[in-house]
């Protein structure tokens, strides 16, 4: 699943490819992806100009002339831009045709991705309704607010970080990496964490996601950026998908368990449960 670094990388790529382009028509081959009224979606998009791109958590934002298109890639969503006629591809579901002859194509093998069209004034309310936490940056991710939220919850810390309410953008890969760096067991109840552990998780969340953005995200199976290029953050993973390998910090064998239905990687020595 694309997490914050992958979505940010896609966003930056699309900025170089489609800003300023005017949509001439829209073609939708899998209508279930569109969460706005379908007729409204098809009626409103033509004649809109893509003014800028943005991101909030794992949501990709297309700022148009007087609307915002919100796209969530879910498990396998990808965007590809073709300067002229695009090739026929099996998993292409939405086509944005531009006046200059180019086409932006949304592909999704699993068909889990979604798109919605809003007026800009409703964007903040939209994310409030999703209970989306702050961005993982020094200015937005307040340590004291984070510690207070942890103290009120019995959820395992991994599950809590994944639910997007504490901080936006973490998924299965980067939660494992953050908790390994912070030396916290993923099954620890949130309210049992010390101030030092909470601080370590806070700081490592910012550091890991920042590094992953610099590396263009992680390509584990199928992720590519808007140019079809792989990310390289997977080369810097210390624990995710390292089951049976030695922990680089202590030499103990990395283990994998199921936690909240998610495969979870950790070092049983560095990340003790008790």
From Swiss-Prot:
Zn finger spans (FPG-type): 238-272
Cofactor descriptive note: Binds 1 zinc ion per subunit.
InterPro entries with a match to the protein in the record: DNA_glyclase/AP_lyase_DNA-bd, DNA_glyclase_Znf_dom_DNA_BS, Formamido-pyr_DNA_Glyclase, FPG_cat, MutM-like_N-ter, Ribosomal_uS13-like_H2TH, Znf_DNA_glyclase/AP_lyase, Znf_FPG/IleRS
Record keywords, A-Z: DNA damage, DNA repair, DNA-binding, Glycosidase, Hydrolase, Lyase, Metal-binding, Multifunctional enzyme, Zinc, Zinc-finger
Example GO biological process: base-excision repair
Superkingdom of origin organism: Bacteria
Subunit structure: Monomer.
UniProt name for this protein: Formamidopyrimidine-DNA glycosylase
Organism: Streptococcus pneumoniae (strain ATCC BAA-255 / R6)
Lineage of the organism: Bacteria, Bacillati, Bacillota, Bacilli, Lactobacillales
Underlying gene: mutM
